[in-house]
Amino acid sequence: MKVAVLGAAGGIGQALALLLKTQLPAGSDLSLYDIAPVTPGVAVDLSHIPTDVTIAGFAGMDPTDALVGADVVLISAGVARKPGMDRSDLFNINAGIIKNLAGKCAEVCPNACIGIITNPVNTTVPIAAEVLKQAGVYDKRKLFGITTLDVIRSETFVSELKGISLADVEVPVIGGHSGVTILPLLSQVKGVEFTAEEIATLTPRIQNAGTEVVEAKAGGGSATLSMGQAAARFGLSLVRALQGEEGIVECTYVDGGSEHATFFAQPVLLGKNGVEEVLAYGELSEFETNARDAMLEELKANITLGEEFVAG
């Protein structure tokens, strides 16, 4: 099993690479790519960690060598948020980066599962889909927007609020991956009751948690370490499913035949070909139903923006 990380010299990429080096199954290959010249050095640094994961690093304008034979490609390349920016402000730079890298994946590893971390995910995933379609290699079972950070934040905040073990907390998060399109289904958390006031406070905190980190870092970065952990959780789940482990479910942003939008985040059963089945997200509370319906216009506009970017 070969996993490639594109954007591996950045804050997310290095954290993700560290976690993959220590947690991928023995015998895995880990390939790091970034335009930054430091990337081969990041691989050398990680190679000193004693795990049975082979690692190589590649720098420069062409990711081909990193992508050859890849089963999973995780893309975190792009610019990060700074104070005052929202994820959509990243679009102009990151859209072009994703278009180019998706094109390389189509050319070099057309059968790989691709997980997109680069924001704005609501838009970068449709960009990748359109590029793969143009190349004639699009398989909607194998393209994912990694929204796991919204899930781990939800689980952490619920655990803190209610004083319960994280081992007992599961929070499905549906919709998209920015602002109001992030919808944690707090009504579905087992064994916990929330007041209307708690839901009205906790939901926007989860939606705006990225801004919380950007402001706390005072211009020094965005959510890199927690995003690295979230991407590793998703990537490792995907690897386990590809290797035949059954019953692995993660919330992720996919082209899954949703009645709401072409791309929609919801629980997905992972399997040997990527998406095994898009699962129903269950009954919503009145608050959640209203929030879902209110977000759809923005989510659809984000998707259209990506499709039109590729169409030119």
Swiss-Prot record:
Keywords: NAD, Oxidoreductase, Tricarboxylic acid cycle. GO terms for cellular component: cytoplasm. It catalyses: (S)-malate + NAD(+) = oxaloacetate + NADH + H(+). Substrate binds at residues 81, 87, 119, 153. One of its GO terms (molecular function) is L-malate dehydrogenase (NAD+) activity. NAD(+) binds at residues 7-13, 34, 94, 117-119, 227. Its EC number is 1.1.1.37. Pfam families: Ldh_1_C, Ldh_1_N. InterPro entries: L-lactate/malate_DH, Lactate/malate_DH_C, Lactate/malate_DH_N, Lactate_DH/Glyco_Ohase_4_C, Malate_DH_AS, Malate_DH_type1, Malate_DH_type1_bac, NAD(P)-bd_dom_sf. GO terms for biological process: malate metabolic process; tricarboxylic acid cycle. The active site is at 177 (proton acceptor). NCBIfam families: MDH_euk_gproteo (TIGR01772). Catalyzes the reversible oxidation of malate to oxaloacetate. Homodimer. Belongs to the LDH/MDH superfamily. MDH type 1 family. This is Malate dehydrogenase.
